[in-house]
Amino acid sequence: QGKYRKINSLGYLGKYQFGIETLKTIGVHNCDAFLNSPKMQEKAFIALLSKNKWELRGIIEKYEGTVLNGIHITESGILAAAHLAGVGSVKKFFRYKGKRFIKDAYGTSLRSYLRRFGGYDTSFIVPDSTAKVKF
């Protein structure tokens, strides 16, 4: 929704709706500072994309540019789905070749994220297994 100070009904934080545990994996431990810093949120988003791009590199290499159950698969769609539904959910989706209905905590399907966020340029995101927010 683009609101940096937003906390949703499940406790996800900021413009990109980060979970607290996810923030910790990229080096953010102060939620108040995070909510009050658009710059930190933007850096956190890039760090998480880098981490997820590393984690999902095999899936991206194998499936990018293909059509799976009617969905044109793109790197940006995969990265968005990983951010919004989790890396594990993305791995499960591709393990079952898109035939399982996988959804996030709000009931939004992973397929819809792949469609909605497909086709964006994410070539500038560098895969990095140890990506952290640099303050």
Language-model features: locations:
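Short, surface-exposed glycine/acidic/tryptophan-bearing loops
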Residues: 6-26, 80-82
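Catalytic and substrate-binding regions of cell-wall glycan-acting enzymes that process beta-1,4-linked
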Residues: 68-125
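Charge-dense, intrinsically disordered terminal/linker segments
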Residues: 28-31, 98-99, 104, 134-135
